[in-house]
Amino acid sequence: MDSGRDFLTLHGLQDDPDLQALLKGSQLLKVKSSSWRRERFYKLQEDCKTIWQESRKVMRSPESQLFSIEDIQEVRMGHRTEGLEKFARDIPEDRCFSIVFKDQRNTLDLIAPSPADVQHWVQGLRKIIDRSGSMDQRQKLQHWIHSCLRKADKNKDNKMNFKEVKDFLKELNVQVDDSYARKIFRECDHSQTDSLEDEEIETFYRMLTQRAEIDRAFAEAAGSAETLSVEKLVTFLQHQQREEEAGPALALSLIERYEPSETAKAQRQMTKDGFLMYLLSADGNAFSLAHRRVYQDMNQPLSHYLVSSSHNTYLLEDQLTGPSSTEAYIRALCKGCRCLELDCWDGPNQEPIIYHGYTFTSKILFCDVLRAIRDYAFKASPYPVILSLENHCSLEQQRVMAHHLRAILGPMLLDQPLDGVTTSLPSPEQLKEKILLKGKKLGGLLPAGGENGPEATDVSDEDEAAEMEDEAVRSQVQHKPKEDKLKLVPELSDMVIYCKSVHFGGFSSPSTSGQAFYEMASFSESRALRLLQESGNSFVRHNVGHLSRIYPAGWRTDSSNYSPVEMWNGGCQIVALNFQTPGPEMDVYLGCFQDNGGCGYVLKPAFLRDPDTTFNSRALTQGPWWAPKKLRVWIISGQQLPKVNKNKNSIVDPKVIVEIHGVGQDVASRQTAVITNNGFNPRWDTEFEFVVAVPDLALVRFMVEDYDSSSKNDFIGQSTIPWNSLKQGYRHVHLLSKNGDLHPSATLFVKISIQD
């Protein structure tokens, strides 16, 4: 019943010195500020899933002193966070490390007694994170159940009495009445000792994890046989799963990958266990495995792609008083974001700073942000990053900005047109591992400066930070008159190549267009919606050859988001959302951009790339986009839905909502009934049907909520899948947390079919 020992043995780490050191624990200095350093004891728990941290706070619960390794985004060595950069410069880098969490909680900055201790912690945690990520769903399930068993075994005798079984079921997030729990307990207690041990616990585990719905699906495929032959598996892959490449080769590869029985594998058979392993794998995911890599044509002009884009990237919270942080840039880049916003203002000591102008948000150095971008720009994707500069700096500090851009970004920075690319926008492929600037520019594509150029020139100032047109917003921030002109130095201007910010002058026919291909306009969400309503097709055509950036309305001081879908339907590429604000809009956004390998660029459908298109999402007509499909979604069951309320006695009452996002007439929502007191294995067996007219623009969102009769339902998890990435047949939908991180074992089991 020792899940940690099982984990170490499974991965050959039982004698690993790093993990042995973590299991023993060590005294570390926790750093919060220049005046706050406290010695605390940290120790890896025996389950190899959690870290215990000593706390001196009075009345702190034991649970609050634990954090899960699953919640760790990364472990950094040295002065690699703002905290250690500011508050631990006096300590050698080889004694410092940081634990960065997936959600927006504070980073844990630590100082170790010696470099060897740092190595143990950094390498040990990385090994657990890497090995946990490589575990299949069955191993994750076993590891999780063993952890719950260990927690429930209060007296640590490796036996389970009836009370401990009840506690165990609560850990699993399932409420069972006493008589049913007692019935299972007696069935497993073969030794009649009023406790379960060894094989009895294994029997109990098997009874608990048996899935009748998998048995039913297996029987559909295998008939009365105990195993699936290659021929029957091919038939299942063709007729149920609708796999395009269904054939003996695919069937054999699935048997080879997922069948745990060596005997069955040798006989080219798949058992029920192998069938479940397949359905829980990436091959059985409702999101297409083929779309987990870059598969689209990346050689088209930038304007032909949707670009993952962040608004006010520097903010971690709201836009009036919240903290600014380089960590916010790192998080956005790690989520595949390719367009970041830098709101630049004069700072002390001739160093430009970034913050939300005229407000009380905290300030960070421009140069520190550039270093973070340099280090993380291409970790999640090799495709270009666009830095959207909101420049409010004096001429002197603009020159400092230009110096930092060259010195810090070096050859990553695109500071001149690509050879031969002077008549249309370059492609993402041509711009691989390049950083582009979006901002004001003097003159045209080629530099206007040089030795004989002017030292500075006026340009119109239409950026959004100066815009804050909503009176309600203005009343909440420091009064600052808007200036119509901004002086711009050539050193900075010359670095803007393919993304020159201009005022939008209206739609023209391509032959008489007043906007050059390298010029782009920004629109507030309200203005963009107005243009889509009044001139929808003109906006679509404009966006075939030009980039358009959309940003949230000025009244969204709480950093709330708008729906990106309408903007995408109009062909707008750089639809900027507040990445720091979780919610349905961000769910749909990240769902769209998990397509094409999560590289941050998604090719628009052909009818949004055609300069002669007649498409208008607000006035649909017949055309290549009109391809009505009937979508049937059968919500069968859920698995290991996480507790929302961490109260020990709390059990979730889950319900599933299926939403369609797309053009107006396709938007729809359906929901299941509520299953009470069962987050471990709820069964719904509920079928929904949707008719989708423009599937190329549709996304399907699966959301699970915890029903509450007296207040708003609590969010449990969700997954949003672009229509063209949705797989048919029996599939598992792997749920994400509100911050977009994968719940390790939480899934929905569904059956999907699409018909003309």
From Swiss-Prot:
The keyword 4Fe-4S appears for this protein: no
Gene Ontology MF term list: calcium ion binding; phosphatidic acid binding; phosphatidylinositol phosphate binding; phosphatidylinositol-4,5-bisphosphate binding; phosphatidylinositol-4,5-bisphosphate phospholipase C activity; phospholipase C activity
Protein name per UniProt: 1-phosphatidylinositol 4,5-bisphosphate phosphodiesterase delta-1
One Gene Ontology cellular component: cytosol
Keyword presence, Phosphoprotein: yes
Enzyme active site: 311, 356
Residues binding Ca(2+) 3: 312, 341, 343, 390
Disruption-associated phenotype: Mice lacking Plcd1 and Plcd3 die between 11.5 and 13.5 dpc. They exhibit severe disruption of the normal labyrinth architecture in the placenta and decreased placental vascularization, as well as abnormal proliferation and apoptosis of trophoblasts in the labyrinth area. Furthermore, Plcd1 and Plcd3 double knockout embryos supplied with a normal placenta by the tetraploid aggregation method survive beyond 14.5 dpc, indicating that the embryonic lethality is caused by a defect in trophoblasts.
Annotated residues for binding of Ca(2+) 2: 189, 191, 193, 195, 200
The species this protein was found in: Mus musculus
Sites where a glycan is attached: 191, 193
